Amino acid sequence: MTSMCILAVDFPLFPRRFAKTKFSGFSLMDVGVAFFIMLAALVSPEAKHKQLQGNLNHLKGVTKKCVILVLIGFIRILTVKGIEYQSPVLEYGLHWNFFFTFACVKIMSALLYTLIPSTWDVLISTALLVIYELALQFTSLNAFLHNNDRTGFIAANKEGLTSLLGYISLYLATVVLGRWIVYRPR
């Protein structure tokens, strides 16, 4: 369904209520990335009770696989800019896209599982969400996200970069669900 929305959104007949949201809330198109992240977490080694703490080979393997995602991300940038295809800046920013987001989530999650015991993922997932919400409420992050300044790499890609905390938290939480529901010892 999300794939159809991604293709159909460029046509005038497509109902705007299903298009990506601009500042808050979510729509049918918004849940596509979240579901993809969740599916990746459900089938991950972390969810399957693999011991990864201290395992640098796992981190290296994930990083190698993510190089392909980063290359696809750059190809997407060049293609979109080359054919002058409209790409809403409020989606991910000027240069950011889904492929960079997914690569960062996979690498950061693998790094976390290499450094910490897997039993801490609930705590870390919750802490990331709390920290992000506190930053939105009590720092200038909210104002930064809603201003039109696109000076520098971080400001140009603020939507994609700041979404990483939420996606990493979602990944960790889904790993926990996978471990508890799908892969629990029987």
Pin down the residues of each PLM region.
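Alpha-helical transmembrane segments and their immediate juxtamembrane cytosolic regions
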Residues: 1-186
